[in-house]
Swiss-Prot record:
Summary of subunit composition and partner proteins: Component of the RMI complex, containing at least TOP3A, RMI1 and RMI2. The RMI complex interacts with BLM.
Organism: Bos taurus (Bovine)
InterPro entries: NA-bd_OB-fold, RMI2
Modified how: Phosphorylated during mitosis.
GO biological process: DNA repair; DNA replication; maintenance of rDNA; negative regulation of double-strand break repair via homologous recombination; regulation of sister chromatid segregation
Positions of post-translational Phosphoserine modification: S7
GO molecular function: DNA binding
Protein name according to UniProt: RecQ-mediated genome instability protein 2
This protein's record includes keyword Phosphoprotein: yes
């Protein structure tokens, strides 16, 4: 039996390495303001709370589709806008690339400035339940305050 690997690969012209660790839930503003590094090595600075940076191998973001086309979408969460690329290659279930739909996107960060940009791994329509949207900002805040404050989260240990 083969040894487990750190990631899976999605084949294609712009292959994405999928991490084995769960995605970190973030808001667009957190990435704009606190992300350090570059593609493949992004970290979320937590110096303001006296913690080591949080490794961002993959992120989970939610937002409303503002515009979409050609495998690219622009979304908006409570803190600002972000872009998602590679949507033509990801499973999405029901059609959700329609302006006004509320979706979740799991992906790998490509850029954080001037606005976050993800290479999509998964997208799901969450529009049927308005609680997803109304609670998202509080959920992210709570996770960062209580769960992601643990020293081993995001380190791959």
């Amino acid at each position: 039996m083969a040894a487990p690997t750190d990631s899976l690969s999605v084949s294609g012209p712009t292959a994405v390495r999928l991490p084995r660790s769960p995605p970190i839930k973030v808001l667009a503003e957190q990435l704009r303001r606190d992300a350090e590094g570059g593609p493949g090595s992004w970290r979320l600075s937590r110096a303001a709370v006296g913690r080591e940076p949080l490794e961002l191998r993959a992120v989970w973001m939610q937002g409303t589709v503002v515009e979409a086309g050609g495998g690219v979408a622009r979304l908006r969460d409570p803190s600002g806008s972000f872009s998602v690329r590679g949507l033509e290659r990801v499973p999405r279930g029901r059609p959700c690339l329609v302006p006004g739909k509320y979706v979740m996107v799991m992906g790998v960060i490509q850029a954080c400035s001037p606005e976050p940009c993800l290479q999509a791994v998964k997208m799901t329509d969450l529009s049927d339940n308005p609680l997803h949207e109304s609670l998202w900002e509080l959920e992210v805040e709570d996770l960062h305050r209580h769960i992601y404050s643990l020293d081993d989260v995001g380190t791959g240990d």
